[in-house]
Regions:
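Transmembrane helix-bundle core of multi-pass membrane transporters
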Residues: 103-165, 268-278, 298, 305-313
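Alpha-helical transmembrane segments within multi-pass membrane transporters and channels
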Residues: 58-106
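Hydrophobic core segments of alpha-helical transmembrane domains in multi-pass membrane transport
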Residues: 18-19, 43-47, 104-108, 149-162, ...
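Helix-loop-helix "hairpin" substructures at the membrane interface of multi-pass membrane proteins
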Residues: 141-220, 244, 248
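Transmembrane alpha-helical segments in multi-pass inner-membrane proteins
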Residues: 217-284
Length: 313
């Protein structure tokens, strides 16, 4: 049971981070379907940082360095969405799809190139971080507390305060609801949308490194992040683009994802002889069912996905 709780919180943390990233972007008026690719790039930045940093450096320095590099990589990669969607006013759905494909391919090629440079016989896309990963975990009475859990809680609270209690957040949401009205009172819609996209990239990149360090000590980048970017979008929609509802939705989906990892620890589930693949499918099937019943009542930001043209005010 303790292991189930541990994995539920860890997987929920990933979904909260990435879904909050999508929330900031869409609240500003830009649809970010490229969260999957951003997660992969953020994961690559963090994993390579763990690989090249000395394993014996202070744990706090390891944690901060990996987090910052993941955030920076995700932020830089999301700038591609900003340039295409905000500056060139391109179709945001197509851009997001392209970012997902490019992110996976680019990360695989970069990691393979680094591995080949270090060892010509190593053509894999693997990055190992067995010792480095220990810096992120503290054992508390059999419960493996991950520092990313605390980080996620802090970011969740900060996201709520930012969106609802600050001028920046209120202006950001105004740009996603009625950009013409926001512009008429002096708000720079383009800057607000850029801010939303870059925050989305930063949180998506951080979610990527949390994902690949959840329970494993190496990662093969050609596998991507198993659709977690899309699952985070479902969490965001189910959570009605509101931080606290997103957190509750993430816990629900995180529970079903965790169950696929630890079901063998529950005798009554093992006795059912259900194939493991069914448990792996659960979070995605649940997301389809939930969205089918709740999508009619979802209220997305009115101007999301619509390029802003100041001349049409």
């Amino acid at each position: 049971m303790l292991l189930l709780i541990q994995y539920t919180i860890l997987f929920a943390s990933i979904l909260i981070l990435v879904a909050l990233g999508g929330c900031f972007s869409e609240r500003s008026g830009v649809i970010n379907l490229g969260l999957e690719g951003i997660m992969v790039m953020g994961a690559m930045g963090g994993a390579l940082t763990m690989r090249f940093l000395p394993a014996d450096i202070p744990a706090i320095l390891m944690i901060v360095s990996v987090m910052l590099m993941s955030i920076l990589t995700g932020l830089i990669y999301s700038a591609l969405l900003g340039v295409a969607a905000i500056h060139f006013k391109a179709d945001q759905t197509i851009i997001g799809t392209a970012l997902n494909m490019l992110g996976l391919a680019a990360a695989t090629v970069i990691v393979k190139a680094i591995n080949i440079a270090a060892n010509p016989d190593d053509v894999s896309s693997n990055v190992q971080y067995v010792e480095e990963k220990k810096a992120f975990i503290v054992n508390i009475g059999g419960f493996e507390f991950n520092w990313f859990m605390l980080t996620t809680l802090i970011i969740l609270v900060a996201a709520y305060i930012t969106l609802y209690k600050t001028k920046f957040g209120l202006r950001l949401m105004a740009c996603g609801e009625h950009p013409q009205a926001a512009d008429s009172v002096g708000i720079n819609v383009y800057k607000m949308r850029w801010a939303g996209v870059l925050i989305s990239g930063a949180l998506g990149g951080l979610g990527g490194i949390v994902y690949i360090t959840a329970g494993v000590s190496e990662w093969k980048f050609e596998y991507g992040v198993a659709g977690f970017g899309f699952l985070a979008l479902a969490v965001m929609i189910f959570g009605q683009w509101k931080p606290w509802k997103i957190a509750l939705a993430a816990l629900l989906f995180g529970f079903f994802r965790a169950l696929s990892n630890v079901y063998f620890g529950f005798e009554f589930l093992v006795d059912l002889n259900i194939p493991s693949g069914i448990y792996n499918m659960l979070p995605y099937v649940i997301s389809l069912i939930v969205l089918a019943f709740t999508s009619k009542h979802s209220r997305a930001p009115k101007a999301e996905g619509i390029p802003y043209d100041k001349g049409t005010r």
